[in-house]
Amino acid sequence: VFEAATRSYRAAGKYAWCFAWGKLRHDPVFHALLRRGLLPDSGSLIDLGCGQGVLLSLLKAARDLHADGRWPADWPPPPTRLALRGVDAHPGRVQVARRALDGGAQVELSDLREVDFQACSVIVMLDVLLYLEEAQQERVLEKATTALRPGGLLLLREPDADASFAFQMTKLSAWLEALTRGKLGTKLHCRSAARWSELLERRGLVVDAAPMSDGTPFCNVLFVARKVV
């Protein structure tokens, strides 16, 4: 499935292909989302800060492989009727995503602080909120919680600011990522895992937090937060 998801980026250029290849093979969150069967089969998903659409490409490839009868028998079935939507503020990445996805997902050029979330089943924010000031983080989370349908899922990944050395490595990686977007001197706004959980729970979400840095020197945590029915 990772090979199929990467293949679509060849037409978008070598850098886009290499980036997708590296993310899908070395970032544990993509494997976890499919292997754990976290996503619903139907409804709608919005990936905020989707970049060049790697997660969307993975979900599209998984759906196609399942339809062709080539899905691993020991894995949970992937979403087959989940409408996919991505949002990113970087024009170049949006262009790459649209080319790679070839109509398999709706990808919009917009600042996530201003986007119309619309009612949805799943909201994904991977390594996104640390680039926003704390007040902005809270406003985005408030909008996200409101947009989620009852029983809906918010998938949030952020670094744990209490993780000492691993946190410094994660910040360095985030700064380098910002540099590739031409944002030299970007200030990061991080919280401890406990503070992230508390912030989500204050909005009525039931939160499960799990480390999401296997095979890396980082201290990322995946927060699986569900809106109570």
Label each region the model flagged.
Residues 1-44, 52-116, 153-229:
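Class I (Rossmann-like) S-adenosyl-L-methionine-dependent methyltransferase catalytic domain
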Residues 48:
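Conserved beta-strand/loop positions that form the S-adenosyl-L-methionine
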Residues 124:
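A conserved beta-strand element that flanks and buttresses the S-adenosyl-L-methionine
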Residues 127-128:
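Short catalytic micro-motifs in class I SAM-dependent methyltransferases
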Residues 133-134:
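Helix-capping/helix-break motifs at membrane-protein junctions
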Residues 138-150:
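A short glycine-rich, Lys/Arg-flanked "PGG" loop and its adjoining helix->strand segment in the class I
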